[in-house]
Structure formats: C-alpha cells, structure tokens
Amino acid sequence: MRRLLYTALFLCALGVAPKARAQYYTWGSDPTGLKWSTIRTPDVRMIYPDTVSGVARRTLFYIRTVQPDISYGFRHGPMRIPFVMHPENFQSNGLVMYLPKRVEFLTSPAIDGYSMPWYKQLVAHEYRHAVQYNNLNRGVIRALSYILGQQGSTIGLLCMPIWAMEGDAVMSETAMSSFGRGLQPSFSMGYRAMGRVGRDYKGRRDRRNIDKWFCGSYRDYIPDHYELGYQICSYAYARYDENVWDRVAWFGSRNPYMLATTRIALEKYYGTNVRELFRETFDALERHWDSLPRTGYSAAPLVAMPEGNYTTYQWPLPLSDTTVLVLKTDYDRPSRFVRLDTRTGAEEPVCYTGLVSTRPAMYGGRVWWTEYRRSKLFEQRVNSQLCYMDLERGTARTFVGRRNALYPTPAPGELAWVEYNPVSYTHLRAHETSAH
C-alpha cells in the first residue's frame, strides 16, 4: 500500500512539473532517416551519421594532428569534448557551446571558401575555442561548475570578449595553413577601403563612437567581429610577444565578480586597454597600407548612389547599354532582383528571392540562381535550390528536383551546375533546358 502511495505521489509530481529540457541551446534536429555512429578516443568523441563516416575519420585525423599545437599561447590545452557532425546543411558553419558542451560541424564545404580544406579549417578554428573554454573554466568558475553544472562554466565566457575569442581562433586557423583566412586580401579589404578607421571625416580620433566598431551599426558599414578580432589579436601578439588572452582568461576565471575583468587584466599585466589596442592596431595598419606601392584605380561605379544608403547591389547582369539587372539587399525588404538604369539610378523591381547561395547567371532572357531552402520539419536540412526567372514574366520559379545545386551556368539549350552530395562528393551536371 505504501509503495502504491509513493508511486501515485511521484506520478502527480511529474504531472505538475514544468516542461523539462535536455539542453538550453540547440541548432535543431537532423532528418530522422539518418543512422548515427560514434568513435571514442581518450580526448574526443565523434558523433556522426553513417553516410559521412569517411568525413568523420578525416576530421578525427585533423584533430589528432593539431592537438600538440592547438593550445599554443595558453597554459591549458583543449577540454574533452564531443564533435557532432551535420551533413545536410548547406549553410556551412561550426559551433562550440555549453549546455551541453559539444562542437558542432556543418560539414558541407563553404561556398565562398579558399584553398584550406573545410574540415581542417573547422578543426583549427573550433578546437581553438575548446582551448579558450578550458582556460576560462578555472578557479572560481570551476567551483561554480561543481554547484551549477555547465551553467556555472558558461559564466566564464563573460570573462573574454567575443571579438577576442573569434580573433584568436582566426589566428589559429591562419597559423595552421599556408594561406589562411587572415591572409586573404578580402579579409582586411573593408578596413583598408575605409582608410581612417576610428577617425572622423577630418581625420581626428572619433572619441564619441568607437563602440560601433565593436558592436556594429545599422547606419554605417562595419566589418564583423572576426575581422576586428583578428587584427587586434595579431597586433597584440606582435607587440607583447605572447598571447595576451591567456592572462586575461586566467585573471577573469579567478575574479569574475569584478565584472570588467578584460579591462582590469589588460591594465594590470600590459599597461593598456581595449581602446588603446584598437587605436594602436589600426594606426599600425594604416602605416603599413600607406607604405605599399600605389596602383591605379580603374574601377568606376555604374551609377551614383545616394549618401548614407545602406544597401548592397550584387552581381550586375547587363540587359542593355543603359540597364542592368542586379540583386538588391537591404534592411527594409527581402532580397530582390531590380532593373537599374545606369544613367538616372532609377530602379524597377522584378521579383523577390530567398537567401541566395551562389551568384546568378543569365542567357536567352532567363536568369538562373540558387538559394537556400530550409526543411519545414528538420532545421538541419538546408538545401541549395536551383531557381530561374524569365525576364518577360518576372516570376521566380523552382527547378524541380535540383536541391543540391551550386553555380548554375547556362549555355545554348543546356544548363550546367555543380552538385554537392552530403556524402561529400561533388559532381558537374548538365541538363537540357528546352523543356523548362
């Protein structure tokens, strides 16, 4: 009788309990048809669908290769952490997160990547975050983790700014490659085009609005925190001949109650602060860029744009001597194709698009492009759908059955495109277009 009473009380408690969650932050679910496997080693655990077992083993090889050097500059190595692989998402990315702790890889290679293999880049970048997390999970933060679990460890992430974490990780992937992201001309092109970063229009230091370079802006174009962090971190390493974030992490994890631990640690150990590092970094970059040989500037805008216009026009396709078709994106409406008169700047909307994945191409009055399409059921199934539009009709249509397409290239009577398979094979496809 007593056992029955306890059972009834337990069931009642379950009935009134709030909804339980297994984790706080998730990237979403994978398709249910995938069968999962695991590879266990003393340091990492690979969790992957059977369809990408080769990718998982290759990634494990990269992890083992970088392990001796991935913690360079920090006093503690990477934490023991599982790697979870998602093969059916074309929006390539990586993530390191607590609650629960794991590294997640979207294994489809980046569309705008470079010569460094995608899995190697992910390992060199995301595994460096595992080093940062382990160095932040010390002292008081570690004590909190015994009481609060991984919620306590998450507090340590407040002791190191996000731009510093990402900049240090970009330094890691750059150092572990022959031509990494930090060495790409496009990676610093935004700052170089601006000229006087952190100064007003008269060339004076802009003391009022320096925060926008760290927080972003809806009015002005500001490069992201990856680019900012890499420039500051690489300058700090060159100036002080050590990784300054090791001491920042060490101090912050032991004194989280001080709140502004980054500022205090930089002043205590290096006699500087974030504002000074920012100014010194871009002063040094400006001197370097000014010392380079001058080259002729042959580019000219198609049409004069209004001042303060925060709009992007991409991939112009000529329609006539005075008209081009461009993809327009801004903060007001979804991306769309517009006809642009190069003489007057007048625009005529043609059709709206989704999130475009690869550049459009045109032949015979028909425009082809690809755009990301997310599954309505599974967040981790994101395809690259082949689409087209006849200029006479101005209606976007879907090329049925082509969901893994990239870089469509039309020709007389035919269409070719690159097709990526989640199993990690890339093919070149061709199709007759007379029926469409």
Predicted regions: what is each one?
Residues 4-13:
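Sec-dependent N-terminal signal peptides
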Residues 95, 113, 120-121, 160-162, ...:
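Conserved beta-propeller blade repeats
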